[in-house]
Each structure stands twice: as C-alpha cells, then as structure tokens.
Amino acid sequence: MKGVKFIRKDERATPRKVDGEAVGLLFRSKVMEGILVELEPVTGFEGTYRHNGEEMHLVLEGAVEFTVGGETFLCQEGDILWHDSDLEHRIHNPGMAPAAYLTILAPPAMR
C-alpha cells in the first residue's frame, strides 16, 4: 500500500559498525529516518556531530548520556530527548551494562 511501511524484525537491515557500535537503519522516508543504536558498556561515538534537522531519541535499554549544546542529559530506559540537530551533540554509554536507543531524524541524515 502506498504511504505505509511495515518491516518485520527479521527483515530489517543488518546493523553496521560505526565507531565499534552497532547502528541499524530501521526505515527511511522522504522526511525522516529511524535508527536503532546499540552501545557497549562505557563506549560512545568518537567526536561530535552537527547537521541540519531535528532528532528524537528514545532510550530502550540501559542509560545513555547525550551532550547537546554543551548540556549533558543522562537518559534512562523510557526517557525521550529531542533537540535541533544543528546543536553540537555527542552520545556516550556511561554505564557498565549495554544500552540501546531509537533515534528518529528529520530530514534523513544517514548515508
């Protein structure tokens, strides 16, 4: 059906490694994309990011530390953080357990 995407768990793309972490593109449309990120304990992405658009992060497991515009937010399972993507941002798992989060980006940013 036009205008609908339904993707079963076993049909999703295989996550790729980015900075040693698993990053899986769940979907992409004309105006947004969904990404599943799994972080090993005490790890994160190298450097900071800044690009056009908006981001919404939903922590699914563990704790994830998001630093956005110089302010740090420690998000636990179930917490949501939204921010403009043109604010410098970085992501880190400060805990001793794995963490996972869902990010929705608008417009799509992954290549």
What are these regions (language model features)?
Residues 1-33:
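A short, N-terminal "cap"/entry segment at the start of jelly-roll beta-barrel domains
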Residues 16-17, 24-27, 36-37, 45-51, ...:
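Short histidine-centered beta-strand/loop micro-motifs
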Residues 27-33, 42-58, 69, 77:
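A short beta-loop-beta micro-motif enriched in histidine and acidic residues
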Residues 41, 52, 71, 87, ...:
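A generic "binding-loop/recognition-motif" signal
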Residues 66:
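Short aromatic-centered micro-motifs
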Residues 69-85:
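Short acidic-glycine-tyrosine-enriched beta hairpin
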Residues 76, 85-111:
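Ligand-binding loop in jelly-roll beta-barrel domains
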